[in-house]
Amino acid sequence: MEQSTAYERMMATAREWLAGKSPESLAANSGAQFDAARSVFTIRSFGEEVEIHYPDYSFSPEIDEWHQMSLLHYLNLADGTQPSGEWISLSMMASGMIRGGGFDKMFENLVRTKLGCLPAETVRVACEHMGMQVVGGNADLCVRHDFAPLFPVTMKLWFADPEDDLPGSGRMFVDRSADHFLTIEDTVTLCEYLIVGRLKRELGI
């Protein structure tokens, strides 16, 4: 109950931040589309079209509550900066040394102990089922999963090689422009809960 109440307070705050802001400007700065006739934003997130109704900022279809909050924070902070094409770990974001560094270590440990021990094809299929796009790269598996139009996320995995006694290894990256759209706290939430958490459930690990 307390957790639900805390979430509701945070959502109320997120909506207050957006109150009075021009929906056209919000759309232009975030890469979303705004239909003035319907008073609806349309934004592509994790491969799906999400509608956000203006001015109450309700969602359809209903999506995970933390996904909703992250998108509202994205709309509020987005300043139109275009992705640079340069990838950084979460620890390299502003104020990311502790929260971002903690996530980097958690993900590396997950890959070393569980994710990287699975067959590469099994993980690839699970990633594609979640809407991730397999892209070229210097890893055994490299996938891209865009949280929002201007907020791409990539994941690189090297799978364990028992013959050479090499453990699995992996990193998750965001574009260097990430600080223009989300705080480190929001970025950790979306990477840990909305991406890694879903992938773990998809794989049953």
PLM segments and residue spans:
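N-terminal leader/targeting peptides and immediately adjacent processing regions
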Residues: 1, 12, 16, 36, ...
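Negatively charged, low-complexity tracts enriched in Asp/Glu with abundant Ser/Thr
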Residues: 1-31, 92-142
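Amphipathic, interaction-prone secondary-structure segments
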Residues: 25-54, 133-160
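Aromatic- and glycine-enriched beta-alpha-beta binding-site module
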Residues: 46-108
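Intrinsically disordered, low-complexity regulatory segments enriched in Ser/Thr/Pro
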Residues: 48-73, 158-185
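Short amphipathic alpha-helical segments
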Residues: 63-67, 115-122, 183-191
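Conserved binding-pocket/active-site segment within a compact domain
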Residues: 118-182
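A recognition module on extended beta-rich or small alphabeta surfaces enriched in W/G with H and D/E
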Residues: 175-205
